[in-house]
Amino acid sequence: MDDMDKEAVELGGQAKFFSDYKVPDPEFPNDRNKDKVIEFSKYAWDKLMHPKVTASEMLTLYSEAIAGMEKNPNIPQLFRDIFKNTYLPIRDPETLKLFLKTIGEFEYTHSEKLGDAFEYLLSVMGSQGDAGQFRTPRHIIDFLVAIIDPDKTDTILDPACGTAGFLISAYKHILLKYSKDNKQGLNIYEYNKFEKKPFNNLGDQLMPDDRKKLIQNFVGYDISPDMVRLSLVNLYLHGFNTPNIHQYDTLSSKDRWNESFDVVLANPPFMSPKGGIRPHKKFTIGSNRSEVLFVDYIAEHLNPNGKAGIIVPEGIIFQSGTAYKDLRKMLVENHLYAVVSLPAGVFNPYSGVKTSILLMDKEIAKKREEILFIKIDNDGYNLGAQRTAVKGGQLEEAIKIIHDFVAVGTLYATSPKIETAIAHLVPKAEIAKNGDFNLSGERYKSQITISSDFPIVELKEVAEVISGQSPKSEFYNETGEG
């Protein structure tokens, strides 16, 4: 790990961040000669990692440094915010020493690797539930981002950003679009499937000013100060020097209601607190359920040509309550163009909840008379606790089907018939027919009709089913053939 203070001194400058500073003496607040000196230089990385510092001393120094970080005026505000009210959870000196030694092997120029390492730590935390809510699997984030396909001029929001996974994936997806080596036009889902990345230098076709403007386009809200802190760190490690992450109650506060965006990506909390949410009066749908309010919020905060992808629990799809039906009616009539059903177990091992993805685009929704339904049975991983990779994943096929549907949707109200193993189209009129606007795709799937004079029966009624053994000689005919 580079010690920037040490490098500054070696180049003839002065230590800036981990340097001693003065604060007024409470008894003599107006007498600068009596200011107290706070010794912060002893916490500099070079001194902390000195070979003569024991593990116990390191634990003490590191704990003191974290506790004093937010008070040091020499530390940039971003980091003071990150370390506000934090503490060191590691109490074993040798464990901390090993951890810091590993971190010390990174260089500042390795920010991408450091960011990837941090995201790995977040995934481990998520599987253990340490951060208070489970996280969206990386491949599902990338899948959703690849579908929405944000570009460099889009303003992008995650209204329940957690650790900023959607924002970082969208950022990398955009960089890929402007990478010289990306001759295949890989999207972020395809790129991240490679264990060894096919190329680096993402975004090398963007000018420095373009990158600065791009970074300012990303915005995240979260009600949890811990999640905000994790987002700030994660984004900083991915090149965001001043991330636009705000501790904000998306559903109860009106302060940012008038903001709108070109792209919204989200996996908001599914659970409502006891007694429900107490939202303000600006929502179109009257409800105290968080999943209803978040979908309403996203739909209402898209720009006229905006598009969104949101992961929702099954209640949004078919619940019969008035608020759920009103929400689905609003979506079908004004916002929704596709529904992707995900298999139960996508969020294993920390939740077996069944979810779907709602895809919104006002422009397409106004032109289309149909909604596209896709059912994913295989997301590329088994549905056990460990979620190991398996063959036959359907996500890439789904991306292609959706993109083809969107391309046609900008020109025509209806499409050539789509009826594949995983996708089919349903007229909006059929969805609206019984008034509940149910978004379960299987409900509208064409039933196979068989023209035959013979009744359909189970195989075991007309044949003996033998399994689990090798054929015996009596099963063969006179010629010895089966």
Predicted regions and their residues:
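Long recognition/docking surfaces used for binding and targeting
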Residues: 5-125
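Short, intrinsically disordered, charge-balanced linker/junction segments flanking boundaries
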Residues: 374, 392-405, 472-482
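DNA target-recognition domains and sequence-specific DNA-contacting regions of bacterial/archaeal
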Residues: 261-267, 299, 460-482
